[in-house]
Amino acid sequence: MYEKQTLPNGVRIVYEHMPHVRSAAIGVWVGVGSRYESPCEAGSAHFIEHMLFKGTAQHSASELAERMDAIGGQVNAYTTREGTCYYARVLDEHLDRAGDLLAEMLFTSNFSETDADNERGVIREEMDMYADTPEDLVTERLIGAAFPGALGRPVLGRPATIDRLTGARLRSFQIAHYIAPRIVIAASGSFTDENIARLAAHFSWLPVRPDLTMRSGSYTPAFTLKRKAIEQNQISIGFPGLPTGAEERFTMALLSSILGGNMSSRLFQTVREKNGLCYAIYTYTASFLDCGMFGISAAVGRETEQRALALIRDELERFRTDGVTQSELDRAREQVHASVLMAEESTASRMNKLGYSELYLGRVLPADEVLARYDAVTREDILGLARETLDFDRVSFSAVGRLRPQEEYAQQLKG
């Protein structure tokens, strides 16, 4: 059972003891990602994530790296459209040191112009890496097209905006956005009350500040093509989805599992197993605080692309007309049951659940309640959501590769 403290300044601490483990995972979750940036600030949240590893008032970047390695654990971070997470997984005897290290990085980083110039090159290389990965590129372009504005902008920013972000501007962005109401500290594993008190002390000095205003987002049907000389065409189809906290999210997870979540799923069986038209095909959800998208991705040959798209459309139409069988629903439930319960055995997974749920949902659902929500979903619920979601009048499409004219894709998908 998890516990929660809220400090007087609004910082929240959620933690859960796991008996019989010798390690702990801690994370500092900051509810600030790329959708909180103005156009001229694009890429700031991600750039700051990099800069916090480049040296503090007490230690150089190399000394920070040595201190990380000296505790024999894993220390890292990542940025999304709606948040940034700095986390560590260590043996319980090193938990205080890991917490001290994260706090030092968060509050005393240098943001020197020399470090910013060097890290700018690293981020450009990261951009190039994603641009050379068609599976990532096609989804990034789909989200960018379907969610115009701040939400759709790349988390990494663009080269032109990155070039204008100085160390001083990044520090100003951090001061303005890393505020108490936006911070959640999550811990799971082996720890003591004293460990939690020490973590709290690192954040108790933050002043009380008004919360930030989020730039709104909404789904808009869009088509985007990127011509690239690669062997396979990477395609991604999008439909309007659900926001993070929607009650129907449990229904959507089962719908996604049945359509494209595993080897027995409809799309995998139809497009790959029965017709041999692809190696990989899967469904996914992209959920944000106020909107979302349901997506399907596949890698197909240029010569078989039209047939694969026709089969995908036919399967989706059949799904929204006929619904699912009881055996399909039973298999999907077992899949999510296994996923939920296996995650409960990992300190890192439980820490992530605590931090994510508190930050974006305002409440952590116990595993038993999550399973009960899945068990309550009926075939009729899935059919109703499928008919609402899989609407080809609101379809979006992204493709990367040796492509046909856009009108042909639009005609094939929209009819």
What positions do the PLM features span?
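N- or domain-start disorder-to-order transition segments that initiate the globular core
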Residues: 1-23
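M16/MPP (pitrilysin/insulinase) zinc-metallopeptidase core fold and M16-derived inactive scaffolds
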Residues: 25-89, 258-277
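Short strand-connecting beta-turns/loops that link adjacent beta-strands
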Residues: 19-22, 80, 230-231
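Charge-rich, well-structured scaffold segments of protease-associated domains
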Residues: 6, 17, 63-214, 225, ...
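His/Glu-based metal-binding/catalytic segments typifying zinc-dependent metallopeptidases
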Residues: 27-29, 210-266, 403
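Short alpha-helix boundary/capping segments
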Residues: 36-43, 243-255, 259, 263, ...
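Conserved catalytic motifs of the protein kinase core domain
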Residues: 23-25, 293
